Amino acid sequence: MAAFVRLLERLGWAARAQQVVEQEVEEECSVPGASGSLLAAPRCWQRLHRGAAATSGLRFGASAVQGWRARMEDAHCARLALPGLPSGWAFFAVLDGHGGARAARFGARHLPGYVLGELGPAPQEPDGVRQALRSAFLQADAQLSALWPRGDPGGSTAVALLVSPRFLYLAHCGDSRALLSRSGSVAFCTEDHRPHRPRERERIHDAGGTVRRRRVEGSLAVSRALGDFAYKQAPGRPPELQLVSAEPEVAALARQDEDEFVLLASDGVWDALSGADLAGLVTSRLRLGLDLELLCAQLLDTCLCKGSLDNMTCMVVCFPGAPRPCEEAISKEMALDEALSHKVAELYASAQEPPGLNTVFRTLASEDIPGLPPGGGLHSKAAVIAEAYSKLHQTPGECQEEEW
């Protein structure tokens, strides 16, 4: 772990420098109370979560990491069964707080209950369920408003998956995203709610607000969120027509046998990898037979190595049609890990002085190495490289550092 953290420190230096510049430029339009400060080293400990439902064939894994941020403001929830509904209904959500974790934690704790209350015992699919999800988000936001300390800033984006035996419902507000992989490719991906999108800009203007620097009132980067009640004060307008709205955009997708998985993630993940890259990386890890929570942990490690500075949470929900473990893929992965370890040893032995870990990584990055994981490339193998390096470059103090 210590070697991996040191590698992240080196690889993240340029990204952190750019972040400081951006903060200086945008200081006058930042959200009050926003937690933009960065740590000297990332906190890489990950919180893992997994579950499975034998009757429906659903299984999920999730992981969350604080990363470079001074505070952890993400939250998530998973309900593999919904009381009062038949087998096969399930609910999952990832929430990304800003200006504090209060809104994200509230949503993770209470949103499933509001969804269940709005669905009732006999949901009408798909239109009735879509409306139930909209109402549940708005009701949760109203209750959050009643409990919110007056004048406090902060809010949370959210992305949710509601599974029924016939449909997949993807509901989101803000820039936490979801994608569906079907037949080996991305079949659907949500679109971020940004103030410059025509529909969002029109609502903001109609509510008496402005969009400056691609932000609501020059400050908030998303146009839909739970919380952010300072932007929900336009008189005479319903909650869904305020400058910032908690009404989610809801897609209803008929289920198919070819459905493989849905990935839900906060924006720190999407900052580092595209939807196609994420789908390819998840697919390749599924073929290795990884437990889903460990798959998510590897994905977040890859994003950290690619320079993401945000809190990150990802959740993978697999359906019966998900890629299965493949002996050939497992053998190739083992051979790749062995080859990378051998290359690290060669670089170490050929240098006049012991090379730094960052030098080793960048040297390998300049080479054409076959068989690297699709989507993640060499960054998804940083832990393997760091482990091989640490075996060659251990110092007396390193053993203690490993326990950090």
UniProtKB/Swiss-Prot annotation:
InterPro entries from the xrefs? PP2C, PP2C_C, PP2C_C_sf, PPM-type-like_dom_sf, PPM-type_phosphatase-like_dom
| Domain called PPM-type phosphatase: residue spans | 59-319
> One short Pfam family name for this protein?
PP2C
Binding of Mn(2+) 1 occurs at: D96, G97
Q: Where does Mn(2+) 2 bind?
A: D96, D267, D310
Cofactors, names only: Mg(2+); Mn(2+)
Reaction(s) catalysed (UniProt annotation) = O-phospho-L-seryl-[protein] + H2O = L-seryl-[protein] + phosphate; O-phospho-L-threonyl-[protein] + H2O = L-threonyl-[protein] + phosphate
Assigned protein family: Belongs to the PP2C family.
The entry's protein name is: Probable protein phosphatase 1N
Query: From which lineage does this chain's organism come?
Result: Eukaryota, Metazoa, Chordata, Craniata, Vertebrata
